[in-house]
């Protein structure tokens, strides 16, 4: 394949990637967006493998087949509830790839011009640094999301000074490397520091902020890919990495704004979020209810809002929830969904589940669109949500989630909370909502309880 054809293919692939991002921004065009991305990646792979500068084509194809088989098998087995940790582990692969490309590029450079050599060495150094941070950060995120690592924030003494020291030392190591490129020791030492830095960055971010971490790591992986593109002189990889990096950063900023969190604080590993942890002891008496009583309440309601959370995903309750929604709407009851920006474990988690269950898009509303309507609502069903409906965010300045905008479900006439137990949520704080006079608890598996309500509605 000629150089001109490769450049043309790269432009087409880049346009398809941009169209893919645009398509994924709306429910109606999301499927088309996926196909744009698939076609674009196929074109990019063919152009790269069969380009004029390509070597070892057979080994590349063998590696692609092995990776493809593993990827297809994993994709067929993965549950929707496991998607957040799958995304995190995929980000770690991008980071590791950038590190390996960096060391490989360092060993195979053929530059003779001193200026170009310095530029190349800067690319190598930064590429390895970003990749190493992304790699260990994503591994920690995977561990937290899968429950293998405690979700609480790691609060080391002088943690911000440690982060700053890591950056300063890495900067000095880069200067040392540029002054003596033949000495690889500064690069090896920087790699070790970057691996520890990435681990500490994500470990010091609490469970309540994990959806932001996923989008933040998405951004990091994009910049790691862009750095690899610079090292390989691959324009398409630079463009693609920049698209992923910038879109991930924008998404992180939007989510931080929705949570009243500082973007810099999340990027810096919890900087400036020193709060006193609230007690997780119960704060009063709670009332329990039954599926039959909830069904009767729903029959007599004129307006219902459902606020789903990660518990709905774990129980796979979205399908019976969609059936209840259809039944109530047939009765002329106004049913809508209120989605918190960080409900679940990754951006858009609840939207994906509801779309999977064929819930109409027009009744799925964002927090800002529906918060003012809770006061005029007869019944709110809180299915698997906890921290995102916690009034302590507004009422307790010492709470770890203080200041975070939440769904104000307690303003409704009746609130039904679906929970397995009275345990605290992912942020590790007690929820005063459970003890309010208009709140009733429906204990058990969310899917089983929703099925029981559906059975009672059909009687």
What spans do the regions from the language model cover?
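Structural signature of hydrophobic alpha-helical transmembrane segments
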Residues: 1-14, 51-69, 120-135, 181-193
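Structured cytosolic domains appended to multi-pass membrane proteins
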Residues: 282-459
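Transmembrane alpha-helix boundary signature
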Residues: 48-61, 73-83, 99-115, 181
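Cytoplasmic-side transmembrane-helix entry/capping segments in multi-pass membrane proteins
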Residues: 31-40, 60-62, 82-94, 153-164, ...
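Membrane-interfacial segments at transmembrane helix termini in multi-pass membrane proteins
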Residues: 243-301
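Transmembrane helix-loop junctions at the membrane interface of multipass transporters and ion channels
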Residues: 104-115, 179-185, 212, 219-240
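Interhelical loops and loop-helix junctions of multi-pass membrane transporters/channels
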Residues: 80-136, 140-159, 262-273
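C-terminal ends of transmembrane helices
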Residues: 16-31, 68-87, 138-153, 197-210, ...
